[in-house]
């Protein structure tokens, strides 16, 4: 009896293992009932419950204006194309600005001519610039080398062939030093008065002994090349 039970148990186990397995690919999920799928917009096509974009359904992107939106009129140089203002250069060949109405235009000054509401400079109206002095203005006398022409002082080189400055009157002129000679109130250097420059030492001043290559002449050290035929350190 025990043997029959074991055989039956083995047979049942074989039947259970022989049952075909269910693949995940064979499992299908049905959509929930009563679920509304929204319609697909432009450029999209509904495939099952999914919206797939199809470029051929929207060859170019365009945006329509909101309904009942007032489009302002286009200004100068622009033309309305649909709801857009497009600039057309032929509608405005040149930029010009009209003055405000009832605006007084001041008269144009010298060298200028009024053209409409604009002052245009005309060189022929002012061949040379000149400025007249204020009336009743005293003009100071011109100095040396200058000649008064109208209200202006003009420099004339022939009136001052050489520049010279006279000293102030009653000013003591110090005596000229060595190598200089007094000419009027000026000291002029004369090289013949100082053929060689030499400086005498102060009295009672000890003169240090001269170093190599030098020989003492009076109170001065004079360099003698024969005393140092080659430089050595």
Curated annotation (Swiss-Prot):
The record marks 29-30, 63-64, 97-98, 131-132, 165-166, 199-200 as: Cleavage. May inhibit voltage-gated sodium channels (Nav). It comes from the Eukaryota. The keyword Signal applies. Each Am I peptide may contain 2 disulfide bonds. The precursor protein seems to be processed in the following sequence: release of the signal peptide and of the propeptide, production of six identical 34-residue peptides by cleavage between Arg and Glu, release of four N-terminal and three C-terminal residues from each peptide and hydroxylation of each Pro in position 6 of the resulting 27-residue peptides. One of its GO terms (cellular component) is extracellular region. The modification Hydroxyproline is found at residues 39, 73, 107, 141, 175, 209. The keyword Secreted applies. Disulfide bonds join 40-51, 43-58, 74-85, 77-92, 108-119, 111-126, 142-153, 145-160, 176-187, 179-194, 210-221, 213-228. Keywords: Cleavage on pair of basic residues, Disulfide bond, Hydroxylation, Ion channel impairing toxin, Nematocyst, Repeat, Secreted, Signal, Toxin, Voltage-gated sodium channel impairing toxin. Residues 1-18 form the signal peptide. This is Delta-actitoxin-Amc1a. GO terms for molecular function: sodium channel regulator activity; toxin activity. It is found in: Secreted; Nematocyst. Its main location: secreted. Belongs to the sea anemone BBH family. Residues 19-29, 30-33, 61-63, 64-67, 95-97, 98-101, 129-131, 132-135, 163-165, 166-169, 197-199, 200-203, 231-233 form a propeptide. It comes from Antheopsis maculata.
């Amino acid at each position: 009896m025990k043997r029959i039970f074991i055989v039956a148990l083995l047979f049942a186990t074989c039947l259970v293992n022989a049952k075909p397995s269910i693949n995940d690919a064979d499992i299908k999920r049905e959509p929930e009932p009563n679920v509304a799928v929204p319609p697909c917009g432009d450029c999209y096509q509904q495939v099952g419950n999914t919206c797939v974009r199809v470029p051929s359904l929207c060859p170019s992107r365009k945006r329509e204006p909101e309904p009942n939106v007032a489009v302002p009129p286009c200004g100068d140089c622009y033309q309305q194309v649909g709801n857009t203002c497009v600039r057309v250069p032929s509608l405005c060949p040149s930029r010009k600005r009209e003055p405000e109405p009832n605006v007084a235009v001041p008269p144009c000054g010298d060298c200028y001519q009024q053209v409409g509401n604009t002052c245009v400079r005309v060189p022929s109206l002012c061949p040379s610039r000149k400025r007249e002095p204020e009336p009743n203005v005293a003009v100071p006398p011109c100095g040396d080398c200058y000649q008064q022409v109208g209200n202006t002082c003009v420099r004339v080189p022939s009136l001052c062939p050489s520049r010279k400055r006279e000293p102030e009157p009653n000013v003591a002129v110090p005596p000229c030093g060595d190598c200089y000679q007094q000419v009027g109130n000026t000291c002029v250097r004369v090289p013949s008065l100082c053929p060689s420059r030499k400086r005498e030492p102060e009295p009672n001043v000890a003169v240090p002994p001269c170093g190599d290559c030098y020989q003492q002449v009076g109170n001065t050290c004079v360099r003698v090349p024969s005393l140092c035929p080659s430089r050595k350190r």
